[in-house]
Amino acid sequence: MSGHNKWSTIKHKKGAADAKRGKIFTKIIKEITVAAKLGGGDPDGNPRLRTAIDKAKGENMPKDNVERAIKKGVGGLEGTTYEETTYEGYGPGGTAVLVEVMTDNRNRTVSDVRSIFTKCNGNMGESGCVSWLFDKKGLLVFPKSIDFDKLFEASIEAGADDVTDEDEQYEVLTDPSAFHQVKTALEGAGFKAESAEITMIPQTMVKLEGKNAENMLKLMDRMEDNDDVQNVYANFDISEEEMEKMM
């Protein structure tokens, strides 16, 4: 299983997605608001906003919520001002961790993030300490029910970097600048992605087991549970056998 998708697979198995639906909505609304503020309220001219709206649709978020968030972003409604930043650190077993946050109180957030690192046998690092271990990429995930050869051909023709056959899905990787072009071309060819996002892909993976594996999952869970954290990325790998011991 590819490491960059390990956490989403684990969450699915733990059945955590539905329980945290409210938090997912909150994070998407924040992203839509900030994207609209920075790049305007027209998704056709604002790729970041388009991606956030697509994510909202994928989570079946009511249209009213999306429109309200856009209005708030462009100044049509009163709302909180958010600041974006990324914290970096080391998780259990020497794993590299990136934490993307959107906050209205940086002091509160940095304290919370540092505390989660410490309590889960990790430590917060300086800016730049682990970001070089990740590549920013567009990632589109497709079900195994579609024809791989046709998907591969259409993806490469549209400008994708790579198409891989993973355990439970097909993955299309793109340069961030080509993400929307590839996504639109594949949709036009009849390929509907199960998920599509700009993400951080680790260059190498660190295998974890035992207490380190437990603490890593705890760290990921607690980071995602924090209202200020938008995304968390880490280069850990946990085997299926190890996962079964912990479930």
UniProtKB/Swiss-Prot annotation:
MF-aspect GO terms: DNA binding
Superkingdom classification of source: Bacteria
Keywords assigned by UniProt, alphabetized: Cytoplasm, DNA-binding, Transcription, Transcription regulation
Subcellular location: Cytoplasm
GO cellular component assignments: cytosol
The family this protein is said to belong to: Belongs to the TACO1 family.
Descriptive protein name: Probable transcriptional regulatory protein GM21_0933
